[in-house]
């Protein structure tokens, strides 16, 4: 039994409702800027590689920026959205995510998914780190050298609703 299962059993003895992510969230792909597009000041952005290497679970301030012109052509996350890296060189890192908790929209690079939901953002980030999610993720991954989960497939992930 996973820690999440234990908490549900303890805190919700009558159980909880389970829904597909697509029923409680909008999942979309990120944009197409690259690290070479960074500038010292401009429009805030998150590159999928930062999710693995630099960022923690919760992000309040951007580390990098792109030009306003480049940003105008990008997909953006809103405060409270989850940003998930959907491409990696290993199964463990694919679907790592962060909660964008800043106070402005932020451009999101390719190889990412933006998950916009009315559910608590921190809850979602913790859920996406759970063994319950991991077992479902294993059914969605494809590739050998580069591992990927197609963002549309995330809609079928079943999630407990608190």
Features from the language model and the residues they span:
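Non-catalytic DNA-recognition/assembly elements of restriction-modification systems
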Residues: 3, 7-30
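Short loop/beta submotifs within extracellular cysteine-rich repeat domains
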Residues: 4-5, 15, 32-33, 53, ...
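Short, solvent-exposed loop/turn positions at domain surfaces
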Residues: 10-12, 32-33, 70-71, 101, ...
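Amphipathic alpha-helical segments
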Residues: 15-19, 124, 155-162
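Short, structured motif recognition centered on aromatic/hydrophobic residues
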Residues: 16-24, 43, 77, 81-83, ...
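Sequence-specific dsDNA recognition surfaces
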Residues: 22-35, 49-81
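A short beta-sheet element
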Residues: 47, 62, 68-129
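A short glycine-rich beta-alpha junction/loop motif
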Residues: 105-112, 119, 142-162
């Amino acid at each position: 039994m996973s820690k999440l299962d234990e908490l549900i059993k303890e805190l919700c003895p009558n159980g909880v409702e389970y829904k597909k992510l697509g029923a409680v969230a909008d999942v979309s792909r990120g944009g197409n800027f690259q690290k070479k597009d960074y500038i010292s000041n401009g429009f805030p952005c998150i590159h999928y590689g930062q999710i693995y290497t630099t960022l923690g679970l919760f992000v309040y301030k951007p580390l990098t920026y792109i030009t306003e012109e480049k940003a105008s052509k990008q997909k953006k996350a809103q405060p409270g959205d989850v940003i998930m890296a959907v491409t990696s060189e290993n199964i463990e890192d694919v679907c790592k995510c962060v909660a964008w908790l800043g106070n402005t929209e932020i451009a999101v690079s390719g190889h990412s998914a933006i998950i916009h939901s009315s559910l608590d953002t921190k809850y979602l980030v913790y859920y996406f780190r759970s063994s319950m999610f991991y077992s479902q993720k294993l059914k969605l991954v494809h590739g050998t050298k580069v591992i990927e989960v197609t963002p549309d497939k995330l809609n079928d992930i079943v999630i407990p609703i608190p």
